Amino acid sequence: FLPIIAGVAAKVFPKIFCAISKKC
């Protein structure tokens, strides 16, 4: 598992979760 992918996922996932759950 590449550290770069982990870094990108760490930045993108919170935004996706925020949009889906509507909890920002």
From Swiss-Prot:
Disulfide bonds join C18-C24. Signal peptide: none annotated. It is found in: Secreted. GO terms for cellular component: extracellular region. Its main location: secreted. Expressed by the skin glands. Keywords: Amphibian defense peptide, Antibiotic, Antimicrobial, Disulfide bond, Fungicide, Secreted. The keyword Oxidoreductase does not apply. Coiled coil: none annotated. InterPro entries: Antimicrobial_frog_1 (IPR012520). GO terms for biological process: defense response to fungus; defense response to Gram-negative bacterium; defense response to Gram-positive bacterium; killing of cells of another organism; positive regulation of insulin secretion; positive regulation of mast cell degranulation. Antibacterial activity against Gram-positive bacterium S.aureus and Gram-negative bacterium E.coli. Has activity against C.albicans. Belongs to the frog skin active peptide (FSAP) family. Brevinin subfamily. This is Brevinin-1Pa.
